[in-house]
Amino acid sequence: MRSMRALQNALSRAGSHGQRGGWGHPSRGPLLGGGVRYYFGEAAAQGRGTPHSHQPQHSDHDASNSGMLPRLGDLLFYTIAEGQERIPIHKFTTALKATGLQTSDPRLQDCMSKMQRMVQESSSGGLLDRELFQKCVSSNIVLLTQAFRKKFVIPDFEEFTGHVDRIFEDAKELTGGKVAAYIPHLAKSNPDLWGVSLCTVDGQRHSVGHTKIPFCLQSCVKPLTYAISVSTLGTDYVHKFVGKEPSGLRYNKLSLNEEGIPHNPMVNAGAIVVSSLIKMDCNKAEKFDFVLQYLNKMAGNEFMGFSNATFQSEKETGDRNYAIGYYLKEKKCFPKGVDMMAALDLYFQLCSVEVTCESGSVMAATLANGGICPITGESVLSAEAVRNTLSLMHSCGMYDFSGQFAFHVGLPAKSAVSGAILLVVPNVMGMMCLSPPLDKLGNSHRGISFCQKLVSLFNFHNYDNLRHCARKLDPRREGGEVRNKTVVNLLFAAYSGDVSALRRFALSAVDMEQKDYDSRTALHVAAAEGHIDVVKFLIEACKVNPFVKDRWGNIPLDDAVQFNHLEVVKLLQDYHDSYMLSETQAEVAAETLSKENLESMV
């Protein structure tokens, strides 16, 4: 049977008819009955025990080879067009941003460049018909379909970001904390700066506040440098020179653990030693370039800069770090042959690398995504390196506040004297916050408040119960209409003439031929009510079967005739002919293929 089932198989590979629901006979009007029939493929997904896991995704090439690409493109067009023959490009980009995707996303470069070229070459005034739309989206159809089906890690992205914005505004009112003054260049930072950016593991983006202003990574670079070292050298080798335990001391103490090595990579001594391990056979410039290339990949090639003023300021006033360096040298903590001054120089350089909240959030999302950059798809860090890094961030990342942060927030994070906080929600998203005023423990005053309120509202804490935590929101769950895909919702949309709802159902891979316990479909209901737009959508976009009989033996055409909806009658009669022809052609093709297969076996 030619219908939306082929599309559903390609998108969901799940779903069943389940329990029976109820709609009345057309002679009584298609009234809402008592029962419901759940779409089990979607309902079962809600009983998950893990926050989010990526299922194997079909590539655009696979979709094209299976003949599904044109159907996906058509359905996407109908969903966005909302009954219009052409789509304004700005309407497409607005709908795209509502899913969390940005037009600047590298994965959509081909799609957006084609749209721009179409506008320049055609006289359509920025309008795309179905054919032009197909050409533009064909190379990104799988990603776009997932976005509009709300199949990303945070399905209701606009609702989620609305909550984030409110938390941001609450933290904005805070006035406590002081800008760090012990590094002269940082003392000039504007205390009113306040920005938050997030990037999910699916590449959904949101920014609020001062998110395009460059700032130095400072200590936020420590977990990144450690991750690079473990990825290139391995865990065992790196931890010959640095430990894994919280120190219980200030981050810049001259102190070693019982084994005579720095306590962990998040204190200055540990970070300096880790810096010394990178490309030991290379000169200073090559070492810095090597790390910078890694950081660029983690940030998806977004903004990355270098503050020479901060670097020089660090070198001129870094007496404590020089003391730590000489202490480490005296205790023989560096690998044999390492130049201690070169290691300190690299450490100062890396602390002076600049990012914005936006590029920093992508770096955090790369950690959240197991080392794979979400906006480029490039595998940057090993899974082992990411696991180790997040573990150390969780236990040692927030200076002397690490224990309390792990207790109250329960997420891996790293703070910096620049006022930055790099926050990771594993398997969900990464965030970068910036607010220069620091509390007495050296963490961003606004940033700490933001993180605490975020976890008090959402069940992101590592030990929040994902099944039974009723007081907290779970943005990973699909809400409302998407979650409750029932035959009642489908038939009620057809009854009320809500084509927009039907488009969303179809794009979400709902079976558009579902029946209630009277065996009535959405096409039966729409035909009985005379909703010509609904009937058109069901037969043109969804290709539903018009010959389904209800328990009284009526097909949708019979209902249209009974209630004297002449336009619907004409439309269904024409569709009957084309549907029967296509069915015949499909059967002939299937028989021919079976015959060829049989002959090849003989």
UniProtKB/Swiss-Prot annotation:
It is found in: Mitochondrion. Keywords: Acetylation, ANK repeat, Hydrolase, Mitochondrion, Repeat, Transit peptide. The modification N6-succinyllysine is found at residue 253. One of its GO terms (molecular function) is glutaminase activity. This is Glutaminase liver isoform, mitochondrial. One of its GO terms (biological process) is reactive oxygen species metabolic process. Liver specific. Belongs to the glutaminase family. The gene is Gls2. Substrate binds at residues 219, 268, 314, 321, 347, 399, 417. Signal peptide: none annotated. Plays an important role in the regulation of glutamine catabolism. Promotes mitochondrial respiration and increases ATP generation in cells by catalyzing the synthesis of glutamate and alpha-ketoglutarate. Increases cellular anti-oxidant function via NADH and glutathione production. May play a role in preventing tumor proliferation. Homotetramer, dimer of dimers. Does not assemble into higher oligomers. Interacts with the PDZ domain of the syntrophin SNTA1. Interacts with the PDZ domain of TAX1BP3. Disulfide bonds: none annotated. Its EC number is 3.5.1.2. The modification N6-acetyllysine is found at residues 279, 284, 329. HAMAP family: Glutaminase. ANK repeats lie at residues 518-551, 552-585. It catalyses: L-glutamine + H2O = L-glutamate + NH4(+). The keyword Oxidoreductase does not apply. GO terms for cellular component: mitochondrial matrix; mitochondrion. Pfam families: Ank_2, EF-hand_14, Glutaminase. Residues 1-14 form a transit peptide. Residues 1-28, 46-67 are annotated as: Disordered. It is an enzyme of class 3 (hydrolase).
